[in-house]
C-alpha cells in the first residue's frame, strides 16, 4: 500500500504540472500509471469476499482493447471492484459505450462531460 501511496503522491504533483503546462497526453499517461499502480499494489479490482467476480479486471482489459492507446482507463473510487474511469476521445465515445454495455449490460456505462472551464472557486 505504501508503494502506491508514495508513488501516487508524486504522480499528483506531476499531473498538476502537466495540466498547467498544457501537456494533456502526459496527464493521461499518469492517470493510466496511477490506475495500474492501484490495480497492482492495492489489488482493489475485486472483492476478497467474492474472488470469482472479475468484472473490473475484464472491464479494464476491454477498455485497453477498445481504446487502442487513444484514451486511458483506470479503477476509480473506493476500489474493491467499484468503478472504471475512462478518458475517451469524443470520436469513439459511442463505440466505447456500446462495447462496454454489450459485455456488462445496458446503462453500465455513463458518459460524463467536463465543461470547458473546469472547476471554479465559488465565494
Locate each region found by the language model.
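C-terminal nucleotide
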Residues: 1-74, 85-123
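Short Gly/Ser/Thr- and Asp/Glu-enriched loop/turn motifs at secondary-structure junctions
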Residues: 76-82
